């Protein structure tokens, strides 16, 4: 029995996971396998999931609400890099793979719900599911490209 099996809204959460941009291609047995590593977190508005500079990183699947990715300067100026909504992912996968600290923070903008798991476990799951790994890494690159384009536009 997984943590999700005990959740009072397990059916809704399973539906939301199946609609996630990265997870929607998983078959039922793979989704069940993934569920055993997931933790469901209900977040308050402005709750920090990941602090810039941290090495403790997780993979997030946004089930409900809005998250933001923000970077802070030494003089406490903040810039929002992106928002993630229901069906999106939020991750620091590239930093984790490079064994670097998180270059940004992730926080909830609204009350939100996420499914989360340590990036080490997520990477192991991806290694066992090559097609998923390919689509996930493509999504990470797409997001990074969008953020780069947005940042360049802001500074022109």
What are these regions (language model features)?
Residues 26-29, 79, 135:
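Alpha-helix N-cap and coil->helix boundary residues
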Residues 47-109, 143:
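Cyclic nucleotide-binding regulatory domains
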Residues 41-43, 84, 117:
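Hydrophobic residues at beta-strand termini and immediately following loops
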Residues 1-39, 95:
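Cyclic nucleotide-binding regulatory module and flanking cytosolic helices
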Residues 107-156:
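Polybasic "coupling" helices that flank or enter modular domains
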